[in-house]
Structure formats: C-alpha cells, structure tokens
Amino acid sequence: MSQTKTPLRGRLAARRSPDSGRLAGPGSLLTSDVGVVAPDAEGQLLAEYALEHGLRPSAQRPSVWAYIRQLWRRRYFMISFATARNVAMYTEAKLGQLWQVLTPLLNAGVYFLIFGLLLHINRGIPNYLGFLVTGVFVFNFTQRAFISTSSVMTDSLQLIRALQFPRASLPLAYVMIELQQMLLAVAVLIPILLLTGEPVTWYWLLAIPALLLQTIFNVGVGLLSARLGSQVNDFSQLLPFLMRTWLYVSGVLFSIATVSSNFKVVALLELNPAALYITLTRNALMATQRESAPGSKPYNKALCNIWHTLGHKKGAPEKYQTLSAYCHYVGANPAHFWYYAAGWAVLALVAGFWFFWRAETRYGRG
C-alpha cells in the first residue's frame, strides 16, 4: 500500500507543546488542548513540508559543476554586457572610444618622459620606447581588471536583488570589457613597435598564448577582487597603493634581469605574475629584447664588461646596449617562464573561482 502524506495541519497538531498548565480565568483550558507549537519546530516542519513538495530555497548555492554550466549558458549575456558597457563608457566624451587607446598611450608618454628622458632609466635597454609601451599596456590590462571588478558587486546591487543568475557572470563580464580594451591597445602597440624598428617575425604569434594566459589569470584575480570588494569596505581604499607597488616591482619601467646581481632578488621579481606576462609579450613582439637578454648568447667576459662600462651611458649606441646578451643570466630560468605563467593562471583561476563561489548566496545582502 502506498504511504499517504500527513497533512500539514495534522503535523502541527502532533507537535504541540507538552505544557499541561492551566490558563487563568473561568472555563480553564489546558494548553495541551490549544496545541501550541514551538517556533523553531514549526519552522523546521514547514521547511520539511516544502522540500517534500519540490520547493527549494531561491538563494541556494549550486554545486561547482552546476555553477559552471550556468555560467556557460550565460556566455552570450556576458559578451553583450561587456560590449554595451564598452560603448557606453565614453559616450559623453567628445573623443568617445578613442579614450580607450589614448589613456594607456598618455600613461606611457608620461612614464617615458620621466623615467626615460629625465631619470635615464632607459640606459642599457635597446628600443626603450617599445619596451616601455609594451610593459604599460600589458600591466594596464591586469591592473584595470583588478580595479574594475573590486566594485562590480556593490555597483550592481539592484540587478543582483532583482534577478536570479550566477553572480560570477558580473566580474567575468568586466574582465571581458578589459580584454576588449586590451585588443584595441594591441592594435595601437603594433604600429609603435614597427616605427621603432622591430621586425615582423613568427615570434609574434607567441603573443597570443601569452595574452590567453594573462586573461585566465585576470579572471581569477577578478573573482577574488569582486568578493573582497563586496565584503571588505576598505579594500577599494587599499587598491591604489597595491597597484602602484605592483607596477614598480613588475619591470614595467626597467629590465628586471639587470636590476641586481643578487640571484634571489631577481628571481623573486621575475616570478611575479605581472612581470612574467610582460616578459613573455616583450620577447614575442620585440627582437631587441630576445637578442639582448642576458644569457641569450654564450658568455663573453670582455663583451660583458664593455656593456657594463658603456651600455649604461646616456646616448650609448645600440651595439653597446645589446652586449648584455653576453653576460651571465641572474635570476629564474627564462626557459621555464611559460610554465610559471601557466601555473599562475591556473592557480588564480581555481582559487579565485572557489573563493567567489563559496559566498554565492551572500552577494546582494546588507
């Protein structure tokens, strides 16, 4: 025989309070006759009854794989959202979308004026303009992804509270916005490299996997930044200082390989993820970097001494600047840079996704 479900009213009556005291007043009644149910027990009973009839909490966190499938189904929404935000970002400016390219160009120009012409940090670095612009554009991609995602959850509270969707789609869409801007920056970077004498080679194709690894890394740190920004009120105040420090230790303005003779210092700086993606992109697009990197040619003490003596002088000919290739390499093994970059990308993606997913039901509350 099939088992019939007890009606909700019958269950509540079965769980009435065991209190047998009498109520004051004429015609006294036992509280057991009234059937009082403890509030906690009543809530638990209602939850059990709802589950039996197929009802589930609206803000229940899905499993990891179910969450990934939800994100994949919304991939077109994220692409459309990113494109629309990119178009709307500069609608009120007279130059419009040109600011997407002008902003990193102006930053690179300021850095070149200060560090290249005034402080002469460019000594010993062939094609310093191309070196600097490449570093600024690549670092700017990660920096903007980190900063923009830090406020995405608080800026989208109305959307989060009104609709049910995987919250990770918001920071992912913002990373897509920065990726679209990075592609525009690359379209500007290539003519600059050609004008500064860099040849077109098959090595340029290596910039594609370098950009892909950096994008994966940015997704991970974007998810991490999104949760921290939504739960730590002072996080947005700390970000400018963190980003400025990260800029100065990532080799954007100088060559890490020649900054110190201490192996541990150089290796630590080179294994910084931002520095890795910058180095991989420079080595892919700039022949001057591949040919002048210390250790790229057999060690020659005499030529290395000439580089240390003349290559750092202001206005030194490029033939002296490229002699650094004959010096010993100090730091991490350049042949392993791709492995390090891939490791950082996977680590950031897995850790960032798990960290964000754990708080899926908390976004939009407060």
Where are these regions (language model features)?
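Hydrophobic transmembrane alpha-helices and immediately adjacent juxtamembrane helices
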Residues: S2-P18, R22-G366
